[in-house]
Amino acid sequence: MTEQQKLTFTALQQRLDSLMLRDRLRFSRRLHGVKKVKNPDAQQAIFQEMAKEIDQAAGKVLLREAARPEITYPDNLPVSQKKQDILEAIRDHQVVIVAGETGSGKTTQLPKICMELGRGIKGLIGHTQPRRLAARTVANRIAEELKTEPGGCIGYKVRFSDHVSDNTMVKLMTDGILLAEIQQDRLLMQYDTIIIDEAHERSLNIDFLLGYLKELLPRRPDLKIIITSATIDPERFSRHFNNAPIIEVSGRTYPVEVRYRPIVEEADDTERDQLQAIFDAVDELSQESHGDILIFMSGEREIRDTADALNKLNLRHTEILPLYARLSNSEQNRVFQSHSGRRIVLATNVAETSLTVPGIKYVIDPGTARISRYSYRTKVQRLPIEPISQASANQRKGRCGRVSEGICIRLYSEDDFLSRPEFTDPEILRTNLASVILQMTALGLGDIAAFPFVEAPDKRNIQDGVRLLEELGAITTDEQASAYKLTPLGRQLSQLPVDPRLARMVLEAQKHGCVREAMIITSALSIQDPRERPMDKQQASDEKHRRFHDKESDFLAFVNLWNYLGEQQKALSSNAFRRLCRTDYLNYLRVREWQDIYTQLRQVVKELGIPVNSEPAEYREIHIALLTGLLSHIGMKDADKQEYTGARNARFSIFPGSGLFKKPPKWVMVAELVETSRLWGRIAARIDPEWVEPVAQHLIKRTYSEPHWERAQGAVMATEKVTVYGLPIVAARKVNYSQIDPALCRELFIRHALVEGDWQTRHAFFRENLKLRAEVEELEHKSRRRDILVDDETLFEFYDQRISHDVISARHFDSWWKKVSRETPDLLNFEKSMLIKEGAEKISKLDYPNFWHQGNLKLRLSYQFEPGADADGVTVHIPLPLLNQVEESGFEWQIPGLRRELVIALIKSLPKPVRRNFVPAPNYAEAFLGRVKPLELPLLDSLERELRRMTGVTVDREDWHWDQVPDHLKITFRVVDDKNKKLKEGRSLQDLKDALKGKVQETLSAVADDGIEQSGLHIWSFGQLPESYEQKRGNYKVKAWPALVDERDSVAIKLFDNPLEQKQAMWNGLRRLLLLNIPSPIKYLHEKLPNKAKLGLYFNPYGKVLELIDDCISCGVDKLIDANGGPVWTEEGFAALHEKVRAELNDTVVDIAKQVEQILTAVFNINKRLKGRVDMTMALGLSDIKAQMGGLVYRGFVTGNGFKRLGDTLRYLQAIEKRLEKLAVDPHRDRAQMLKVENVQQAWQQWINKLPPARREDEDVKEIRWMIEELRVSYFAQQLGTPYPISDKRILQAMEQISG
């Protein structure tokens, strides 16, 4: 670069100082950019072009200097007297504090002083105001004093209204506007001077600006900062800006008389309210000299209500004017226009320090204001109406001492005033820091903990705010940068001028179509509850409020109350409505406050374009919307207590005043948690925990347990537990684990699906591999060894080496295999040799057969080597239709491969004295198996015989203990259906037959397709009845045994599964068919039976006489069937039997009836002797006799005992009579003999219970029961004699012989 070029660059840079600040920055950046241009000619051309642009920009500065208006200062303002001091302080210091009362002129004159210093030419003089109204009115006033139009030299900018031009030197604006500009202009280069007015209000915006400007000053040494404040602790601002100078401007004031007029002066004056107190104060001031009255009110709605009430008083020559921020410009301007008569101005605290209302001589101060305050208890930013501080009260008082002596009437007592705090808490200390952090993050102002606030908030409160914003999903924390990042939702929340919790509810309500209900509820949560509950009228107030209760939600009680108030307000005058509130125990001012907040909220919602629903919303939708702001206020009820576990393990109970108190639901959310004697949840509602998860995704924690392979899903599944702040909103949910732990899922997929074969798939390699593995596993089960098949780890490694690492489920495998199998279809196929370990012994098929043969039956065998399992060992598979054909004989021999082990186990089960004769047991087992032919005899018969031959020692049957033989050496019987599905299994074949008898019968009936089973038969019309029946079904023959079945009025032919049942049914059925075809012998019996026998039959104690006669007839038929060779199976045989029975039945029945009459007579006599008083020594004997008689003579005993036993029955009764005679003489001997009989009888009962039901009907089995009766005769009536020698030992031997 040449010397000439350097001079050009330097010259241009020097000329930048004459430009406006923003132009200076812009050109400086361009100049430094030009330095990078390498071509000298091109660089020179750019310099020439920039020189022209700099000339134009410099011309703008000259024009601005020329346009600066003539500046004059009103002599009557205190600030004019201090102008020189202020001017010098601003010239010599970067920051100046100007303190003075409202009316001193500092707001309007400071910008003019700055202009006189030459400020506002190269940059704007920014002048902030706390409220839009003040920004506009101050701009108009300064423009008026400078004789210019607003929007020219003096401009202003507020929300939705921008009146700033290129010629503007002083820019009035709200502090919020300046904060918003920081986002685009971090150095505030459009300003050379900034005036922060009304800093004593210490709003959040003001504290933001003061902190930001402190950080900015070192980077902008040219920037002048002027802080104006009422005379309320200006030293604090000075200290904040490194002891900046303070210029005090004393206002010109007159003495003000303070009068205290409390609203309720006496205890019994409870009907007097604030409105009446204002009426009284206005009336009192009307007695004074003429002057305007300023009444401070806490809100817009209260102003309107009071204005309406004052207008109705028709005060003479009095104008009522409201003053608040949301009034139209024309309505606001009326306050500052000249007027005649008296004026009453109703204003919010905007008129306390920000605006000077001209002509005010009197002030009425109710002592309250709506002050935004965050409740850490409720976690909600509220706008309660609360008492103002002493400083604010004095500011209000000062408003009436500007033009003359004034009077301030305070609607509270002097003691109340003196007890109030000296200063109002700055907003930073009484606001929700979540909101502060949200706004700072939105504005990019950095970490709140490091930000230089005038008064820094507590770090714990900062953390509380961060946690709340994270809960609401408004911010995320960047741990590396130690900063917060705004989410898209957080960006929306920052635009809503309400508490973030409530804002979150309203935004969510838009999704659920319940914005109206959300606004009603959130505005109610912003104020103190309008429902009052006076101590002396609790029951009455509760009854009134109960009308609005909702049994599931206290939040909906607000909606119900709102709707009620809306209806009443439409129907009633304002006075009547106020009275209604009083009778309904509703605080009228709080109701109006509620309505006021709702109106403000609705306006903001409208500005944001959020639609408000006109139709009522559903319960679920409303509470999901509310839930988004109360996620840390949910609770789960303890099972055994009326208590809830809340967020972070807090324990709370529903407040007694809640509509949910008596029937608390499982899950609730509450608006606030209040701790008194315990922690109470107030304003509660039932929620479904399922609602929480979708709106708390950023807060939920998921834990997983029991990851496991699921065949049906083809994937690894796990149990998921979802918690929010420690509360299990989902206790146990099955989820796919693939995305959570892919490595583990891949391993489990290979191990379970491929190695273990637990997978539903059609892949050919998989089918072949399972088949090969099953063959090798079968060898292990047969030999009861675990050393043949390679271990699972070997198979896992096989698959692991070949399958892609991306395969973590069946779906992934299918996709991968579809591509891979085209090139290497045998990649995953096993070889049988790789499945068998080296050195494994071969297994003989003869020792471990696959089938068991019994007669013509061929039954499949399976093997299981699972000690402890029900089917451990060998299992015989028996198709259900063959169950009745399978016999138990032979199965005790086991298969050849286990037979030696079985014999050894049996020998070891012998009692030690016997067992010692057969040691060592393995040797004797081998010798036994070498000498016998298996299955020729029952195993124990063969074993006893051979052991006796080898040693001469006899082993009794009771010495063997099958229960000591290991289960795997006992055959398991498994009955299967036609689909080979297990129906039942066990080690007792007879138990299975008994349990499945009904199913076997159904099967037999189902295969009887040639019509063999019939019903409704009255004659033998079916030819020959086969004694057995076979029918082929599938691969085997079904065998059954047909028989006639007695059905009372007819007979049927049915199939039975065994010949024993067939025999019993056939006899009864044949008897019935004979009776159906033979005339009844009753008439003959009546003619031939002697009168004595008739009488005996008629006095039958066992049912009706006709039943007894039928019993005799049946017995007669049985006798004749038996006498003629038993049941017949052909039509011819039945015809011959029919003729013989018809010929002989009458006389046979008469003979039987005579014997029955003798039996009944004996019973009658015995019963007579049993009646009356009983000696206790005879009680047991008599009881035994009654039991014996019950077994001999009963309803149906004639056929039951049979014709052969009728004579014996009479003898047994005669034996009882003999016993009774001896019993009275020697009861002790009777008891001894009775005990012997009981022992035998118990042994018989146990034995009979073990027999199959059908077997119990066989004659040899029945004979044991009669032998016991003969034993009784031998003990108690020996003189009657017995037909054969009898003893208890003979009976036991007979039972043993039958058992085999």
Curated annotation (Swiss-Prot):
Task of the protein: Not yet known.
UniProt keyword list: ATP-binding, Helicase, Hydrolase, Nucleotide-binding
PANTHER family: ATP-DEPENDENT RNA HELICASE, ATP-DEPENDENT RNA HELICASE DHX37-RELATED
SMART domains noted in UniProt: AAA, DEXDc, HA2, HELICc
Residues covered by the Helicase ATP-binding domain: 87-250
Domain Helicase C-terminal: 274-444
Residue interval(s) of motif DEAH box: 197-200
The name this protein goes by in its record: ATP-dependent RNA helicase HrpA
Gene name for this UniProt entry: hrpA
Protein origin, superkingdom: Bacteria
GO molecular function: 3'-5' RNA helicase activity; ATP binding; ATP hydrolysis activity; helicase activity; RNA binding; RNA helicase activity
Gene Ontology BP, a term: RNA modification
EC number: 3.6.4.13
Annotated residues for binding of ATP: G100, E101, T102, G103, S104, G105, K106, T107
Family: Belongs to the DEAD box helicase family. DEAH subfamily.
Record SUPFAM superfamilies: P-loop containing nucleoside triphosphate hydrolases
Catalysed reaction equations from the record: ATP + H2O = ADP + phosphate + H(+)
